[in-house]
């Protein structure tokens, strides 16, 4: 289960391989850091944008994970289970293109998680002298981690809400997002977003009070309380 403070905020996991970090406005962009492959399809694409002022090469690496989080266990995916194309992209400044992911794994009722790392590599290695006399790259390699969720081929989207106890439970076999905004007039930044995997339970006192409370599943909003007029927030 993940919690995100501020429902419009995005927590990017960026790793600069060298000591200089590129400005976020001039680096790789891949959109939402969690994306899903729906149960009824075997294909999903992810758009990559080069926001730099010069050309970049993009590559990806995939690890199977038992469950997203700080203590996740990473393993090599079973051969042929999750394929992608192309092997790499070469994008000029401002260009964008798609990586495509193809699932050929089991068609059962279990949800599967993969950590997909997008690696942005400069086409040229520009360097400068550091104050200590060393050589530092001015265009670092950047790695952005995302999570691909393959929804079960036999999907069951189920949930329960108990207003008395302030509890939302994921009783199905696939993930969804819970948006909690305390009060009917609170801002997006005052809300919380929770990512509930199968079996996860959220207990929050705000769920017992009036507020805008939604589930987000397959980009659709589901209002779970009638204490405020319907006004769907952003899903980002």
Swiss-Prot record:
It comes from the Bacteria. InterPro entries: Ig-like_fold (IPR013783), PapD-like_sf (IPR008962). Induction: Negatively regulated by H-NS. Positively regulated by IHF and EcpR. Residues 1-27 form the signal peptide. Keywords: Chaperone, Fimbrium biogenesis, Signal. Gene3D superfamilies: Immunoglobulins. The keyword Signal applies. Belongs to the EcpB/EcpE family. Part of the ecpRABCDE operon, which encodes the E.coli common pilus (ECP). ECP is found in both commensal and pathogenic strains and plays a dual role in early-stage biofilm development and host cell recognition. Not expressed under classical laboratory conditions, but is functional when constitutively expressed. This is Probable fimbrial chaperone EcpE. It comes from Escherichia coli (strain K12).
């Amino acid at each position: 289960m993940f919690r995100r403070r501020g429902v419009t905020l995005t927590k990017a996991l960026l790793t600069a391989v060298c000591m200089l970090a590129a400005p976020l406005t001039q680096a790789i962009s891949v959109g939402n850091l969690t994306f899903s492959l729906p149960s009824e399809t075997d294909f999903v694409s992810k758009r990559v944008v080069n926001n730099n002022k010069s050309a970049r090469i993009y590559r990806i690496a995939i690890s199977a994970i038992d469950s997203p989080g700080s203590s996740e266990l990473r393993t090599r995916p079973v051969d042929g289970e999750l394929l992608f194309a192309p092997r790499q992209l070469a994008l000029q400044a401002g260009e964008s293109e798609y990586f495509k992911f193809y699932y050929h794994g089991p068609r059962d009722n279990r949800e599967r998680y993969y950590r997909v790392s997008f690696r942005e590599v400069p086409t040229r290695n520009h360097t400068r002298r550091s104050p200590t006399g060393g050589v530092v790259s001015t265009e670092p390699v950047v790695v952005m981690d995302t999570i691909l969720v393959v929804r079960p081929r036999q999907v069951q989207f189920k949930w329960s809400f108990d207003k008395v106890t302030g509890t939302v439970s994921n009783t199905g076999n696939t993930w969804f997002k819970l948006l909690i905004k305390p009060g009917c007039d609170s801002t997006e930044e005052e809300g919380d977003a929770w990512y509930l995997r199968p079996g996860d339970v959220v207990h929050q006192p705000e769920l017992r009070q009036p507020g805008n409370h939604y589930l987000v599943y397959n980009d659709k909003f589901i209002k779970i309380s009638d204490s405020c007029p319907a006004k769907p927030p952003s899903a980002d």
